[in-house]
């Protein structure tokens, strides 16, 4: 463990402890989304959003290096990246989730300063960006209508009966595309 936080606020301290325990429960062989349910899948969106925090809390460089190798093996020939690694759902290319191909190696590099993960992941990173460029219907934007994007997933401002937040899907995808570039 590398990251510690103690404050004068018991609620904040408990929150931080819960984040630590969440990482312990979810980082076994792949970064899973939740250990308490039968699902326990390696959702790429969960991994990319948590990678920076994971690297602050633990020496997660080897863990993510191994997982990025798994991700690269799961990537499709067209460069699209699965939403789950290992790919047991046969779904790929969703914005935010597929961007794990770029965001995870970048955050690991930023945390530990070793560019090897970038070198090892470069082909997959480039493949992901090429996939967007080759399949988009609008130059310089991420408009891949054939892919079921999740968007602003589990936002509090979602419509009744939906898990997708009110943030426009095109905006979310464009922001991820810009960040990944």
Language model segments and positions:
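Hydrophobic alpha-helical segments typical of transmembrane helices
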Residues: 67, 104-105
């Amino acid at each position: 463990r590398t990251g510690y936080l103690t404050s004068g606020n018991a609620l904040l301290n408990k929150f931080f402890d819960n984040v630590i325990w969440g990482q312990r429960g979810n980082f076994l062989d792949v970064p899973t989304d939740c250990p308490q349910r039968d699902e326990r899948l390696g959702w790429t969106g969960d991994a990319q959003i948590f990678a920076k925090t994971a690297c602050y809390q633990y020496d997660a460089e080897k863990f993510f290096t191994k997982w990025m190798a798994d991700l690269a093996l799961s990537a499709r020939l067209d460069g699209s990246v699965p939403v789950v690694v290992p790919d047991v759902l046969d779904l790929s290319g969703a914005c935010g989730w597929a961007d794990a191909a770029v965001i995870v190696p970048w955050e690991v590099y930023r945390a530990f300063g070793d560019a090897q993960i970038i070198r090892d992941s470069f082909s997959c990173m480039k493949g992901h960006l090429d996939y967007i460029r080759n399949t988009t219907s609008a130059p310089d934007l991420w408009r891949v209508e054939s892919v079921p994007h999740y968007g602003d997933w589990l936002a509090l401002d979602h419509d009744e009966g939906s898990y997708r937040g009110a943030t426009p899907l095109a905006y979310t995808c464009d922001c991820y595309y810009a960040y990944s570039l």
